[in-house]
Amino acid sequence: MQIRGTDYTALTWQGDALALGFFENATEITGDLTQLDDRLEGVLRELIEEKEFKGKAGQKLVSRVGSKTPIKKLILVGLGEIEKFNSQVLGDGAAAIARLAKGEKVKTLGVSLPQREHDPAQTAAILTEGILLALHQDNRFKSDPEDKEIKLTTVELLGLGEQSTAIGKAEKIVSGVILAREMVAAPANEVTPLTFTEIATELAQTYGLELEVLGQTECEALGMGAFLGVAKASELPPQFIHLTYRPANPVKKLAIIGKSLTFDSGGLNIKGAGSGIETMKMDMGGGGATLGAAKAIAQLKPNVEIHFICAATENMISGTAMHPGDILTASNGKTIEVNNTDAEGRLTLADALVFAEKLGVEAIVDLATLTGACIVALGDDIGGLWSPNQELADELKVAADKAGEKFWQMPMESKYFEGLKSPIADMKNTGPRSGGSITAALFLQQFIKETPWAHLDIAGPVWTDKQNGVHNAGATGYPVRTLVQWVLGLAE
């Protein structure tokens, strides 16, 4: 399928299906729409009136057009209130159009939607991402896939002019999102710690990245007792992956760290019935997004040096598993009383944060499916953002808005660290039930000295049980697009 920008407008374009977007209560047939309605033999007005189309968010219609017109089908999508129009709304509109076109077996599609911030290039990129993400099909594990081959061969973005650069950029970003989606969607017998190394190796070889993989012995030499404590029970060897994109003259040096638990049984504090243990293949969502971001950024080639870090292992049960009550020593010398083996992700991140800071980076972002408490607080669509550095937090919020992904900044309430204090170690790995996502962030903060750092809890948005905007049911690839936009923003 080819996506391209064009100077043709809805008034001049010819093809199988024309898609139009309307804001809520702005569906009057006036001006250019009058000419378009005449061109379509009155179908536009008739469709809006008969179906009571008001342009509300999520509203969509499709209709055949008279055989004498240059358009065979007409697709209408509602964009909601104009005051709430943003990148997410635009991308979701493109996704809705793409799915309708697929269902109608359209071959050539013309898309006419409002521009984002009067910027044709930005608009073309958002539309491209929305279309490609909506049409992505992951049928790897089906013997007889229900989704049939997509008939769509050409999508033209109307009125935006030639936008090959913006479209190409979006396609590269989407390739990273799809890598993350497919890693998270795959079961734990398909994506193991060793699979992480294989994927990182392929990225390094394909895009000229530097790769360092530390095994058990190397991690022991660095004193990574927190990471290795989690890894003890698994028969699969731990893999500490350090992938580097290094341009010739970087203006910034950053680290992105993803929690990479390829399966989380809970350890000896095993996840019981009704806990969703069968979904714990996605506990490596942060690591999948980290490698997805690496794939996109390596193709986009910004002048920013980035270190991608994944401490990959499983949290399993065996005779060698860490016990509740064990004391682990992290690589910065701090001791941790393990009062819950099911709070293991923060232990792996602790050593990864220490490792990243020693690289001399200027900012660190970690992302993790860390706490159910964050889902309770923010639901399934919004990720939590914690940072003691407001400048970094603001950069990430701007990037998320541009990417069409949602984050909400949460408090770093230092008083809550009282709940993590241990009588026999420097800290416990979990605190009281209340404020659990905040105490998790405060725990991670103990492994950062001075470097600007942000923590993203992505436990909710990494997966969706049903179609949601640009995402189909399953893994979303969140927040690859935010990470990429953050890096690109610093490269400007």
Curated annotation (Swiss-Prot):
Domain of life: Bacteria
Catalytic activity: Release of an N-terminal amino acid, Xaa-|-Yaa-, in which Xaa is preferably Leu, but may be other amino acids including Pro although not Arg or Lys, and Yaa may be Pro. Amino acid amides and methyl esters are also readily hydrolyzed, but rates on arylamides are exceedingly low; Release of an N-terminal amino acid, preferentially leucine, but not glutamic or aspartic acids
GO MF entry, a single one: peptidase activity
Keyword RNA-binding: no
UniProt KW keywords: Aminopeptidase, Cytoplasm, Hydrolase, Manganese, Metal-binding, Protease
Annotated catalytic residues: 271, 346
Cofactor names: Mn(2+)
Family affiliation: Belongs to the peptidase M17 family.
Name recorded for this polypeptide: Probable cytosol aminopeptidase
